[in-house]
């Protein structure tokens, strides 16, 4: 299915990412790999295991749990953590949970800030991590397109897009003062197509939600929202409908739209992806809750 040229291209991307991961492990005192359980995280974890094979990567995984992830994501996370033998740190913003912060009563912007951004900052401070791997790619979204591979964050974990460090070729500046940190994006130069073809080439396990199947959904604001548990409040006259859907991107289930699809295998997903004309993150409500939404979130310390 993949031409020799495509396989060579993927191997070049693989080599670049492995170099970045090893560079961080050698350069920083206390790195961590942020594990959001999506396809990009799965590829990044696979690359980290390759980078240090036959040993175990010398840093832990960390999942910032909002408590609203799909059930299948949490099951997959626990299974993978046990398989790879890495420490898994789970962090929940307990103040937010105690206050009952949720995407329905408080809106996606406040919910994301409290349960994702503030939670991540709490965890980074608590464990004193000076570098955090993330699975973001430049082709995903405009603000991510201009972010460096080594993305400097100040002592408040804020990102200033107007004051980024020069990054020439594969020379990365990891110097930080106490309290400062670097967000590292080994998949920066990968595209969505690269990710899917690499998953196919390497037989990387992913959450089953990426594959099409009959699932109960309701339509809200133009998005197909899956009814994953009893916490989703149904509106008057709203009845979940069983449809063949899958997810191109995974987040908190009330804020993540499915796409109607019958693509139930990797070759079918890749073929469908080649024909689509919409961004994979068009199904993420948090990207559209206000103008310049993602850049604003990243300035405040978001992933």
Swiss-Prot record:
Residues 281-303 are annotated as: Disordered. One of its GO terms (molecular function) is ATP binding. Pfam families: PAPS_reduct. It catalyses: sulfate + ATP + H(+) = adenosine 5'-phosphosulfate + diphosphate. InterPro entries: PAPS_reduct_dom, Rossmann-like_a/b/a_fold, SO4_adenylTrfase_ssu, Sulfate_adenylyltrnsfr_sub2. One of its GO terms (biological process) is sulfate assimilation. Its EC number is 2.7.7.4. Belongs to the PAPS reductase family. CysD subfamily. With CysN forms the ATP sulfurylase (ATPS) that catalyzes the adenylation of sulfate producing adenosine 5'-phosphosulfate (APS) and diphosphate, the first enzymatic step in sulfur assimilation pathway. APS synthesis involves the formation of a high-energy phosphoric-sulfuric acid anhydride bond driven by GTP hydrolysis by CysN coupled to ATP hydrolysis by CysD. This is Sulfate adenylyltransferase subunit 2 2. It comes from Chromohalobacter salexigens (strain ATCC BAA-138 / DSM 3043 / CIP 106854 / NCIMB 13768 / 1H11). The gene is cysD2.
